[in-house]
């Protein structure tokens, strides 16, 4: 939804007001999944890959304070193409419509506008196809490759090895940043249950220990996992 909102923003330069309607399952899960916040961020010009997680609360507060973005939840209707549908409308200062588009969240970070075809997830076919873990092991053995080598060979069917490495570096950096932020951010998670963050307390307790045992190592892994879960619940950037 953030990507869809950001893309719609390009279709409505200079708009004075926005109205967004979420349909079907996207409406039902919207608030629980932070969809309304994601749309506000997108219409504020933000993108998932580049937004600073530490700035999200401030950006949202500013977007809400403007009062120019209305979001409705239509629980009873689905758009024809997909259950995760959104309708964006933009208006000028006189209240006249200047743009309207339907967008769909297709999963996996992919979006589509109106009747446009779904974006291809790959630009080519894998060099060594497999569909199950068993066929993956067989393909690796048949080609005398490790699993990592086989996957790299497939990835380089549509990207250069340098592009694959750069993409992995970005993903790893995002994962590390997510863990780090989750471990250092105290407070209450969003939602009506008022759940306190646990990961920072676990980090402090484990850091006070001297010699680390195998059990402590497992506790660190648990702390990292909880940190990521809490960042996800708080609307942070996760992989």
Task: List where the protein language model places each region.
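Generic structural signal for hydrophobic core residues of well-folded globular domains
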Residues: 12, 43-46, 182, 229
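Short Gly/charged-rich anion-binding patches and loops
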Residues: 3, 34, 220
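Short, functional N-terminal and low-complexity linear motifs
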Residues: 9-10, 26-28, 140-143, 189-195, ...
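Accessory "access/gating" subregions that flank catalytic or transport cores
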Residues: 162-239
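Alpha-helical support elements that line or immediately flank enzyme active sites
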Residues: 1-11, 239
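Catalytic-core signal marking the mid-to-C-terminal active-site face
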Residues: 14-22, 26-159, 166-171
């Amino acid at each position: 939804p953030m990507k869809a909102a950001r893309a719609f923003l390009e279709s409505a330069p200079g708009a004075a007001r926005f109205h967004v309607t979420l349909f079907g399952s996207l409406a039902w899960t919207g608030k629980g999944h932070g969809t309304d916040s994601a749309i506000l961020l997108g219409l504020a010009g933000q993108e998932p890959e580049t937004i600073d997680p530490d700035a999200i609360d401030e950006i949202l507060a500013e977007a809400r304070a403007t009062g120019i973005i209305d979001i409705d939840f239509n629980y009873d209707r689905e758009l024809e193409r997909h259950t995760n549908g959104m309708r964006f409308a933009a208006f000028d200062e006189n209240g006249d419509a200047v743009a309207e588009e339907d967008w769909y969240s297709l999963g996996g970070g992919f979006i589509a506008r109106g009747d446009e075809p779904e974006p291809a997830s790959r630009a080519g076919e894998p060099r060594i196809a497999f569909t199950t873990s068993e066929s993956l092991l067989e393909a690796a053995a048949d080609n005398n490759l490790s699993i990592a080598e086989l996957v790299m060979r497939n990835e380089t069917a549509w990207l250069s090895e340098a592009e694959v490495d750069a993409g992995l570096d970005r993903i790893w950096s995002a994962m590390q940043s997510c863990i780090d932020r989750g471990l250092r951010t105290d407070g209450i998670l969003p939602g009506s249950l008022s759940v306190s963050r646990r990961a920072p307390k676990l980090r402090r307790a484990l850091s006070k220990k001297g010699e680390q045992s195998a059990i402590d190592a497992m506790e660190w892994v648990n702390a990292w996992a909880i940190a990521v879960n809490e960042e996800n619940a708080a609307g942070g950037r996760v992989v």
